[in-house]
Amino acid sequence: MATYLFYDTIRLNTSAGGVLNVAEVLLRSMRLSGDDRVQAVSERHPRIYEAARRLGMSRFVLDTLLYNFHRLRAWFSGERVISLFPNYFLPFTLFGRHADSIVVVHDLQYKAYPQYFSRAKRLWLDWCLGRAARSAADVVFISRSSQQDFERHFARCERAAVIFNPVDAGAGAGAGASIPSGAGSAEGRYLIAAYHYYPHKNFGGILALFERMQREGLVDYLDITGNGAADVEQMIATMAPGLRACVRHRGLVSRDELLRLYRGAAAFISLSTFEGFNLSAAEAATLGVPLLLSDIPVHRELFAGYGFFVGGPAIDLAPLARYLAAHRLSRPAWAHSRDCAPDAVATRYFTLKRSHASLAGALP
């Protein structure tokens, strides 16, 4: 039996956002394994973690200290320890090339949109990802598109795997999930979108498409979740008053409320120009909700055959209307819903090191 140390020190970064959510779901699902012991480092070393939090210590420093401590301890004790780093960083060490490690690379947004990152941050990411490429760690990419982006800039990893993000969409999710049709609930027919402050999320494009769909009678409202109330108000200020009243900013909502909003929506909409995975779209798809998506590689990879791809602002609305009507009738299942089930994702992570151990045991 191996011990998996999950470096949840990412929680020290208060702006981790979606990456933190993914890490928490992955940790919960891996803990259900009966074959291996899985422990978060914040629980293995609660006093050290709490001291680091109070002192504002960088997670990179804490990861480096704890990783090297456990490397030395494992050498003396003979314990098989596997370290899992959920967000790109492999600690500095003089002890080998991280063959005992798994590191997750989510996306290369800083390469696609360098203007959003300082020069120091870009250099840091270049250095960290270059080290991951040269390491003996299992490097996990959250989509094939993300891996291809990585390999355009860095060397091909010695041990690379594509494992989709775990999608926890609550009880009753998956094939055949019973959802409202979005055709006339008490809250009206609404699109649902998650607001994000980065311009590449193309929120202006969402507003423009909603305006056209509303005028054609396809939907009544646009519901927006997340922060950014002031930004949303500024963006809709130029709309006609009647249309402006149809944009409903719901703010930060509970997990249960978010899933309820997904289930009642006429469609989920995301027109971003770059994604590494798009967890919100995957959550909606797992619940059987129609998707209106920008036509980018990762959306094609994940949602081809399920979602409707919006090629540009002048899109013909007739095919879109037919898609929504057909989806309401057929209620198709998303092809990757099982691949993204938390238990299936956890199994894939365990398989990475189990396969290496089996191969090593078979060698003479």
Question: What is the role of each PLM region?
Answer:
Residues 1-364:
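Carbohydrate transferase catalytic cores enriched for Leloir-type hexosyltransferases
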